[in-house]
Every structure is written in C-alpha cells, then in structure tokens.
C-alpha cells in the first residue's frame, strides 16, 4: 500500500444525545472533545442524534406509513390540475 494516502483510522467513542448510550468503535471521524473510556484510556468523543439505541426501527417503535392515504391526499390536492391539463391537450 502507498504511504500517506489513507485516512487516520483510530478508536472513537460515539454517544447518543437522546439516550446517553456510548460505544467505542473505530472511525476516521475526529473531534476536539474527549472522554475517558472504561479501559482508562482517553478517546475522541462524537455526539450523534440517532444510534441503534434510539432509532425507531431498532427499538421496535417503528410505525407503518399509510402510503395509500398519502396518494389519495395528493390526488385530492393536485388531481384536478392533472385532469384539466389532459382536457386542454
């Protein structure tokens, strides 16, 4: 491999802003903020809005979108315009 062309890949702590859950992984992301981890070492800290701890899909709080209702609502709003354009064409 060529030297000095690869990004710095190092341990980083990611913290979920909503739940406070933190986990240590490797990343190329960097931060000026640091945190002392359970092993006694200090790592860069990156605070994120959503992780697997808070995302609705992974927590089981996922809701199903009513796409049929959304299509009907769209047609109610803009369907008349499309019908008028077809008549004029």
Swiss-Prot record:
SUPFAM superfamilies referenced in this protein's UniProt entry, alphabetically: L28p-like
One term under GO cellular component: ribosome
BP GO terms, sorted: translation
GO molecular function, one term: structural constituent of ribosome
InterPro entries reported for this sequence: Ribosomal_bL28/bL31-like_sf, Ribosomal_bL31, Ribosomal_bL31_B, Ribosomal_bL31_sf
Keywords in alphabetical order: Ribonucleoprotein, Ribosomal protein
Signal peptide positions (record): none
Assembly and interaction partners: Part of the 50S ribosomal subunit.
Family designation: Belongs to the bacterial ribosomal protein bL31 family. Type B subfamily.
Record's protein name: Large ribosomal subunit protein bL31B
Gene coding for it: rpmE2
